[in-house]
């Protein structure tokens, strides 16, 4: 079981697997086939929406339909934001509050985070996979 950051999920949704690292690409394929489980922090969905509105990302369908697809997919689960995730996020000192909350969710669940960025990888507080 794994937790995804925003960019890997968007690359997967945009059908751009070449932008994912080899291990991340395999994990998303396995989840798509129901052989693995990737948790999507609720805050990731909010960040995706904000980035769509800003024009940074495009999705292959309407946002609500895209989110609903994760409810129906056996290899994905949306993880709600709760106080435990927020509490865990306090150990991270990244400039981006989304990064802190996503990393806090991974720490709370005790799962590796699918992410490329070196700032979280260098923290040694959670395992990252790319």
Which residues make up each language-model segment?
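Acidic, PIN/NYN-like endoribonuclease modules and their adjacent C-terminal/linker elements
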Residues: 1, 103-130
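Residue-level signal for well-ordered alpha-helical positions
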Residues: 15-16, 51, 92, 126
């Amino acid at each position: 079981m794994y937790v995804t950051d925003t960019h890997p999920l968007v690359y997967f949704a945009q059908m751009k697997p070449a932008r994912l690292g080899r291990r991340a690409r395999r994990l998303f394929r396995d989840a798509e086939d129901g052989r693995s489980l990737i948790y999507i922090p609720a805050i990731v969905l909010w960040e995706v929406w904000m980035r769509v509105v800003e024009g940074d990302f495009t999705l292959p369908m309407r946002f609500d339909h895209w989110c609903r697809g994760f409810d129906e997919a056996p290899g994905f689960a949306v993880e709600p934001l709760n106080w435990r995730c927020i509490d865990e996020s306090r150990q991270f000192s990244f400039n981006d509050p989304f990064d802190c909350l996503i990393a806090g969710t991974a720490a709370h669940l005790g799962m590796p985070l699918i992410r490329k960025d070196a700032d979280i990888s260098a923290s040694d507080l959670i395992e990252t996979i790319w």
